[in-house]
Amino acid sequence: MLPLGPKKALLEYTLFSSELLERKVYVDAISDFLKNYPTGGYEVLEEEEGKIPMTCYRFDLKNSPTLLHIGTAGGWTKPSTGYTFQRINKKTKELVDFLKQNKPLHKFGKRDRFWFYDLLFIDVLAKDNGSGADLFRRMFEKNAPKTIFNFLDEKSSFQEEFQIMRSFNIKQFLRALLKRIF
C-alpha cells in the first residue's frame, strides 16, 4: 500500500504464479487484505491490471546478429520486482554505447550477479509463493532505504549486498542454489 494522501492510497496486489488466475482470485485477495486493515471502510476509485513477466528466462537467446529485442520483450524487466522503467533507461544508455562499436546485436547484454540474485529469488518464490511478503518485509525492516534502493537498482556494493542477504533466511536461498547446481 502506497499512501497518496491522508485518505487516499494505491494498493497493489502482486502474485507470483506460473499460471494466470481468474480475476476473482485477485479481487478477493485485495478485499481480504482491506477487511483486516483498520480503515473504517473504503471506496475503490480506479482499477487496473497487468501481467509482468517476472522471470529469468533467457530472452537474449532470441536475438540475432541483426535483431535485438528490447524492453520487456528483451528481458529488461527486473525479474524479482517487475520494475522496468529504470532498467530500460539503463539498458538504453548501454545499448547506445554498444551500437557505436558496430558489434553483432546478439552480443549485447550480459548476465551478471544481479541476474543470478534474481534467479535465486524467483526460485525461492516459486517454491513458496507465500514467502514473498515476508522476504520483502524483512529486507525493508533490516536495511536502510538507500541500501535497498541501491540493491534494487543494481548499483550496490558487495558489502551492501551481503547486508541485504543477511536479512533473509539463508536456508531458503541455499536450497535454491543447490537445486540449481545439482
Where are these regions (language model features)?
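Short hydrophobic/aromatic-rich motifs at helix boundaries and adjacent loops
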Residues: 1-5, 67-68, 104-109
